[in-house]
């Protein structure tokens, strides 16, 4: 039971959009039944998980904001990150969500990507041209225990230079 008013609920941590719709609806309804009446309920989603059916269901259950893991609109860098979506799919997901009634959309971007064909500034411009009201930018973090981390250690992959990361952060 909630000890005080909860103004926002955030379903994050990766890909909660992969929840079966009935599971997610149960989570949302339990939040609401606990006496909370949040002004905002956010769901993180990857572009490839966004369909009209899911968008309509999320709206019906009370999701008010989508935080979409765009990462970049650069297809080459998306492939490098082993992402399942393309830059165009990210754009289409945002436009579909807006067209179906989501008033609050967030796009997550990553800066500090090595060997970009398009500058991070172009990702920012594209995101700002879309109907999003929030942008989050995260630096690429290379963890030793990941495939990328091991490949960097072996010299098979490069990382962005410190000056590039600083310049992109300054944007």
Regions found by a protein language model. Give the residues of each.
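C-terminal scaffold of the Radical SAM
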Residues: 1-171
